[in-house]
Amino acid sequence: MNRLISPSIYSVLHQLRSRGEWLPADCGGDGSCGRCGVQIVEGHLPVTDADRLFYSQNKLEAGFRLACQAIPSTSVVVQIQEQPVAGIQEQKDAGTEKIRFVIAVDIGTTTLALQLVNEETGIPVRTALRLNPQRAFGADVITRIQKAMEGSFEIMHRILREELLNAIRELVTGIHENQVMGVSVACNTTMRYFLEKRLPDSLGRHPYSVEDVGTKYLPFSTVFEDSFLSCPIKLLPCLDAFIGSDVVAGLLHLNFLQKQKETLFLDMGTNGELVVGNKHRTVAASAAAGPAFEGGGLSCGMGGIPGAIDAVWLERGALQVTTVEQLPPIGICGSGVVDAVALGRNQGWILEDGRLAERITGNALEIWSSVGGTPIVLDQQDIRKIQMAKSAIRAAVECLLQAANLRAEEVEEVILAGGFGTHLRPRSLATLGLLPGELAKKSRFAGNTALAGAADAWIRNDADICMEQFLRQTTTFSVAEFPGFQSLFMTHLAFSLE
């Protein structure tokens, strides 16, 4: 897509934002992430120091620039890459006008997931997946809180609200508004503040206090400033600043509080929430893992949407891939990333310290390519981000087990959730070092439990009782302040084969 940019004291990124076009800017626009690239079609933009960090000389000569650093002194036409977003996926026929529905919503830091669910059967009828437009203000919640405090709060609230509203409109196409009985929302605590149009300043500084984050029912028009639906909205309860209602909903869906055995739950989103325990007691924490395991912040990364590479393996000396819904590859999601890095480590393409082996050309591991197409790769910066994310999660798991006074062998089941894709291989998890081998072999992938739990929270009669029980019996702690976390984090940066 080509865009005409006028001469201005403002950056290309700023001008695009003012038109409602939200390029990813994981760093918030300070030139340190390299995600807001554009290509000059006509005109001139000077090369900046930040451009030289992220682009080769050939790319610079081809006109690639970082939009956040490009200040146009004359008119220029730039090409921006269209962000891949899944539309509506039909699971079942919506049926007759007699059917009643609930809309389940999972507001993630990186992705938005919504489902139209048959209220009687609990079966999803339609699913909508979107990128969270707030990605333009940073990849993680801390960066976004900072941007909100610097004056961007109103626009950050508005673009989130409008993206959700547009997705809801698509979901209910062809369905009478009286058939929609309610909207049930699960999200992390920061997204809850943004949705309710509350400044999240207290979430970004010690002691990270929260207010009024219990279960709440609100009119649709109050939240979305639009009355095309007249049903209530149910906001599910958050535990604290770091354990949101997405985790609470996920545990509800898994019937976590009915488990006799010690179970470890990992929601592998940008915030990396972890819970261990059983029906009698639970301990929870979160780790700032970043969006890499959701495909965010990677050169060819994306969520688990149709066309995303979700599995990678070696067969007869050649890389093989599958994609979500068997569509032509357009990027790579979390499960594909885990497979690719684990395979690269096993084959010696990726060294223990995370560097690409010298025999890998182009400073990138090519996952897939086609004649005349853009190859899908993991470059050195991608691998570093994956390295940091896996180390944060691995160290957090070990701290959590210590806090709960448990050994790995005492945990009988490990449940992984989040926007990985369609599956995860235990062998890849162990090779990557994301989990100890003892836990990796006990793991299973449960998909988007927050989204499924949001529907359960509306449909199940015992939902509120179960969620309140979890809030009462759960203790939390700060992983970053836990003794030994930094040492564990440094130790697990290495891709040590287990």
Predicted regions mapped to residue ranges:
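N-terminal phosphate-binding loop and adjacent alpha-helix
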Residues: 133-174, 297, 308-311, 385-388, ...
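Fe-S ferredoxin-like electron-transfer domains
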Residues: 46-107, 112
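Immediate flanking context of iron-sulfur cluster ligation sites
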Residues: 6-34, 41, 45-67
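Catalytic phosphate/nucleotide-handling subdomain of diverse soluble enzymes
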Residues: 278-280, 298, 406-471
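Acidic, glycine/GT-rich loop-and beta-edge segments that sit at the periphery of enzyme/chaperone cores
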Residues: 64, 234-247, 456-498
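Conserved phosphate-binding catalytic cores of ATP/NTP-utilizing and phosphoryl-transfer enzymes
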Residues: 85-100, 230-263
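Phosphate/ATP-binding catalytic cores across multiple sugar-kinase/actin-like superfamilies
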Residues: 162-171, 247-250, 254, 387-409
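Glycine-rich phosphate-binding loop of actin/hexokinase-like ATP-binding domains
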Residues: 114, 122-135, 139-140, 201-217, ...
